[in-house]
Amino acid sequence: MANPKEKTPVCLVNELARFHSIQPQYKLLNESGPAHSKMFSVQLSLGEQTWESEGSSIKKAQQAVANKALTESTLPKPVQKPPKSNVNNNPGSITPTVELNGLAMKRGEPAIYRPLDPKPFPNYRANYNFRGMYNQRYHCPMPKIFYVQLTVGNNEFFGEGKTRQAARHNAAMKALQALQNEPIPEKSPQNGESGKEMDDDKDANKSEISLVFEIALKRNMPVSFEVIKESGPPHMKSFVTRVSVGEFSAEGEGNSKKLSKKRAATTVLQELKKLPPLPVVEKPKLFFKKRPKTIVKAGPDYGQGMNPISRLAQIQQARKEKEPDYILLSERGMPRRREFVMQVKVGNEVATGTGPNKKIAKKNAAEAMLLQLGYKASTSLQDPLDKTGENKGWSGPKPGFPEPTNNTPKGILHLSPDVYQEMEASRHRVTSGTTLSYLSPKDMNQPSSSFFSVSPSSTSSATVARELLMNGTSPTAEAIGLKGSSPTSPCSSVQPSKQLEYLARIQGFQAALSALKQFSEQGLESIDGAVNVEKGSLEKQAKHLREKADNNQAKPASISQDCKKSKSAI
């Protein structure tokens, strides 16, 4: 309601009920909705009629149902009394006396009210007490009237009223009507007098000692207080203090040092006030350079390299629009592989973003909104490796990032097509020929004729390599007996210990390499079967083979000769 004195619908319903001598009844029918936004349903019964209405509170529901009852009720309404006329014509709550006081202060003229005695009533009848004539001895009292005289500057006004306050208001009203249209008089006091009055007002609450120090400071004069005399008994001592202010000095006496100091300052202050006033020095006005307003950049190129969320918020602030509104739409995926979908709304524009967590999803949504609004992508300004301070020369896998997985078996090297073609070309350049190779220990159970085998040609080797690269297994290698191993060099590339073990197995005896080596280094012969020889005719041959195994063979030709000798011996 605009006017607080206006009656509410509930009040009007109560008046209507009193006019018809009935009792209104309000009933709370229903209460629904969440705790922060409930809705109340109220029923009003007025006589035989009922009305229902809802509101966000019980009071609002009552007001709504009462307003509905006033509109739809068929009961005759009482006649409204007219409002009382305001006797005071002055608008607002300000009385004429208060308004006159403000005007008098502006004019610099005080408003003085003086009450006046009322005029005596004239007695036109003499009480002669004639017989037979009607003479009223007791007259009715006449109404008393108060008079007030108002003086504002050189103007006088008179007011009258039934009370003294009414008389003051009447006089103030007359003064306002007369002085409102008159110009305000200008005062031009002398600068010296006004300055002295202002100084006196300022110095009213200061002590004499403080005033002495202020005057001495303004005139660059030294000040010193000194107790020159102390006399009297201990319980009634008297102190004399001398104060010196430049060329002026004075003495003061009192029963305490503080009192004597104050009296001395009062005496010297009277002499200091006689000095001529100091010339007024105008202080230069301080000039403050205005800082230029910070320019908020909201162009398409602004903010590249920033966080998209911060960049989008700054753009909205520069536009003086509402900040972006982020909403989590859904959360899907396995417990350890979640995927969040975040939506951002800027005005009428809507964009979404996904990510493994809410932070990345929010960032992607802000990036999508920036692109949708016509801004460039928020590219990073520097390499992430430079930020983390990692070694630039390290080309291995970065910590914290999973390596890409493949389904190929381990041990197979994947080559690019260019490298593979170069390998094939280099293999074809090698002249094809037959070379001798040594069999693996797994094939030692085969006959001695298979000890030296013919190696496959370069064409078959290329076929085996191609099958291993493509499929991981080589049927060709299994067919020719290589079993995935590469072609070997001649007999010279086989370790001497393997050769010794193979020859000992063929000859039918066992050899312990550690014992043989230990005894050979010490220059001793074995006692208890370090080397057990079943056939005495082969002892010299085994000793010869042992020496060949311990020494480094320098030439492949010597090895092939030994191999031939051992074969012929067998």
From Swiss-Prot:
Polar residues bias: start-end ranges: 83-94, 551-561
Stretches assigned to the DRBM domain: 8-75, 95-181, 207-274, 307-375
Chief location of this protein within or outside the cell: cytoplasm
Subunit structure: Interacts with microtubules. Isoform 2 and isoform 3 may also interact with ribosomes, and this association is independent of translation. Identified in a mRNP complex, at least composed of DHX9, DDX3X, ELAVL1, HNRNPU, IGF2BP1, ILF3, PABPC1, PCBP2, PTBP2, STAU1, STAU2, SYNCRIP and YBX1. Interacts with the exportin XPO5. This requires RNA and RAN bound to GTP. Interacts with TRIM71 (via NHL repeats) in an RNA-dependent manner.
Tissue expression profile of the protein: Expressed in brain and neurons, where isoform 2 and isoform 3 appear to be the most abundant. Expressed at the neuromuscular junction of the extensor digitorum longus, tibialis anterior and soleus muscles. Expression at neuromuscular junctions is most pronounced in slow-twitch muscle. Also weakly expressed in heart, kidney, ovary and testis.
Residues with PTM Phosphoserine: 188, 395, 416, 426, 440, 455, 492
Superkingdom, taxonomy of origin: Eukaryota
Keywords: Cytoplasm, Endoplasmic reticulum, Microtubule, Nucleus, Phosphoprotein, Repeat, RNA-binding, Transport
Motif Nuclear localization signal 1 boundaries: 273-291
Induction field: Expression in extrasynaptic regions of muscle is induced by denervation. Expression in myoblasts is induced during differentiation into myotubes and by treatment with nerve derived trophic factors such as AGRN (agrin) and NRG1 (neuregulin).
Free-text note on domains in this protein's UniProt record: The DRBM 3 domain appears to be the major RNA-binding determinant. This domain also mediates interaction with XPO5 and is required for XPO1/CRM1-independent nuclear export.
Segments of this protein annotated with the region Required for dendritic transport: 381-570
Chain span(s) of sequence motif Nuclear localization signal 2: 373-412
Cellular component terms per the entry's GO annotation: axon; cytoplasmic stress granule; dendrite cytoplasm; dendritic shaft; endoplasmic reticulum; glutamatergic synapse; microtubule; neuronal cell body
Mutagenesis / variant outcome for changing residue 237 to A: Abrogates RNA-binding by DRBM 3 and interaction with XPO5 and nuclear export
Name of the featured protein: Double-stranded RNA-binding protein Staufen homolog 2
Gene Ontology molecular function: double-stranded RNA binding; Hsp70 protein binding; kinesin binding; mitogen-activated protein kinase binding; ribosome binding
Role summary: RNA-binding protein required for the microtubule-dependent transport of neuronal RNA from the cell body to the dendrite. As protein synthesis occurs within the dendrite, the localization of specific mRNAs to dendrites may be a prerequisite for neurite outgrowth and plasticity at sites distant from the cell body.
Modification sites for Phosphothreonine: 405
Compositionally biased region (Basic and acidic residues): 194-203
InterPro entries recorded: DRBM-containing_protein, dsRBD_dom, STAU2_DSRM_2, STAU2_DSRM_3, STAU2_DSRM_4, Staufen_C
